[in-house]
C-alpha cells in the first residue's frame, strides 16, 4: 500500500473517532439535563400549614382567601454584574502555601446551654362539658324566657292579650324590637298552619323559630389559619371591662394546644396591667409576646407584633387593643389607625368585637359605633353565664349583621366555647 493511502486511511480513522467523541458528549449532556429537570419536577413541594380544621376545643378555624399579588421585581439596572471587581489586582503580593501560617488547632468546648423550659399545657376540656355548664348557668334565663313563652303558646289559640304578653316577654329578654317582630311573625304563621296541643309540640315549634332567627348557616369559624407567606392576623376590640385580654389569652391557649405557633401583640399601652396580664397568659400557654413601653404608640406595637410573626414563621398573630369607650372619638380614630398600619404588613383576617352579655341595651350602641370604625367580622359574647337575658344574642346579630362566634362562660381557662345556635336555644328551653 502506498504511503499516501496510509495517510488518508489514518486521517479518516481520526475523523471518525473525533465524530464519535463529539456525538457521545452531546448525548451525555442531553441525558444529564433531562435527569436534572426530572428530579426538579418530582421534588417535594412546599408544605402548606393551612386548611380548615376543628380544634379539640370545638372551635372551628379557617383561612381567609386573599387575592394573589404579583411578586415585586427588583431593578437590576444599577447593580453590579456577577464577577465585577472580582479579579485580584496585578500588583497584589502573591502567597504560596508555605507562606500561610495556620493556627494551632484547639479543642474548644462550649458550655452546655440550658434548654428552654417548655411550658406544660393542660389538655383542653371537651366542648361538651362546657355546654353542659352553659345549660346549668342559664337557669335564670330559662325561667324568664323559655318557660314563659311555652306557657303562652301551649294552647295554640292565642288572643290579643296573650300575643301582647308574648311580645313583652321577648322584649324583656332583650331580643329587641326587630328580632321580636320577626319571632312573633314566624310564630303566628306556624300556629296557623300547625296543631299545637301539648308542651312538646310548643317546644318543637318554638325551638325551630328561635334557631332560624339565629341564622345557623352563618360562618362562625375563626379565620386564624396561616397564609402561604404570612400568619393570620386577629384584632380584638371592645370597651373597657368586657374581657378582651382574657379572651385573647384563652384563644391563644386553644391555638397553641392544637400545635399552632402564636404571637400576641400587647397594643393596650395605656394600661400597664394589660401587658402584664397578657405576659402571664403568654408564659402560661406557650405563646410569644410583643409589647412596648407604657404609653408607646399602639399602632407601632401592633405592627411590630405582625412583623415578629412573619419573621418567626408564626401561624397566627392576635392583637389585644386598649379598651375604649365608643364616645371617645380620638380613641376610636386610633383604633382605625391600628388596623391601617397593620394592613401595611399583612391583611387583617378577623376583627372580633368583645361584648359583655350583661350590659343589655347599652351594648347595642357600642356595636354600631365600632362597626362604623372597623369592619367587624364577628362577636365574642362574654359573661353569658351571668345574664338572665339570653335574648341579647339575637339582637347583637341583628344589629351587627355578623355572627356571634364565641361565648365566654366563666373565668376558667377553658370557659371559651364556640357559639352554636341549636345548643343555645336548647339551653333556653330546657
From Swiss-Prot:
Compartments it resides in: Cell membrane; Cytoplasm
Annotated GO CC locations: cytoplasm; plasma membrane
Catalytic activity field: GTP + H2O = GDP + phosphate + H(+)
A Pfam family per the record: SRP54_N
EC number of this enzyme: 3.6.5.4
Source species, domain of life: Bacteria
GO terms assigned for molecular function: ATP hydrolysis activity; GTP binding; GTPase activity; signal recognition particle binding
Keywords: Cell membrane, Cytoplasm, GTP-binding, Hydrolase, Membrane, Nucleotide-binding, Receptor
Mode of membrane association: Peripheral membrane protein
Gene3D superfamilies referenced in this protein's UniProt entry, alphabetically: P-loop containing nucleotide triphosphate hydrolases, Signal recognition particle SRP54, nucleotide-binding domain
GO biological process assignments: SRP-dependent cotranslational protein targeting to membrane
Functional description taken from the UniProt entry: Involved in targeting and insertion of nascent membrane proteins into the cytoplasmic membrane. Acts as a receptor for the complex formed by the signal recognition particle (SRP) and the ribosome-nascent chain (RNC).
Subunit structure, interactors included: Part of the signal recognition particle protein translocation system, which is composed of SRP and FtsY.
Protein name: Signal recognition particle receptor FtsY
Annotated source species: Mycobacterium leprae (strain TN)
Recorded name of the encoding gene: ftsY
